[in-house]
Amino acid sequence: SKLREILLHKAIYNKRDLQMTVEGMLYRMRTGCPWRDRPKAFGNWNKVYKRFNAWSAAGKWFKVFKMLVAEPDMEWVFIDGSYAKAHQHSAGAASANDEAIGKSRAGNTSKIHLAMDAHGLPIEFEITGGQINDCTQAPTLISKLPAAETIVADKGYDSERIREQVERQ
């Protein structure tokens, strides 16, 4: 499969249980269930969790994402932001890393600012705290995009500065 080739290319060791480990990670990302509640068929939850964290810390998931979107259809690009409520204990102990959790009316939230190609496939994203406005994050997101024929966005991105940036690009 395409994903398997990318994983091996990104120096992820091809262990016997690689497929089920990755399936377990993807299942957890799709459903949002706690790691412990994944079906047992995906293997030991703690082992899968530790691998996921190690790959994330090493930037391997981001590299996999970039390889999966190697040839986006840039005729139309859609950008928008969406909130995700963070767990009540997510703002626990202080960390040196930015966890992208902010305070908003809904409590602790994160926000994904996403750009999609003409087929609706994600091509670029930024994750911020939930209190970050779409129009303040748009310049960063747009600057990462290859040239697009048309960029479509909702009124949260309506500003002269963003229009000028899109026209320059």
Regions found by a protein language model. Name each.
Residues 1-169:
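Short alpha-helical elements
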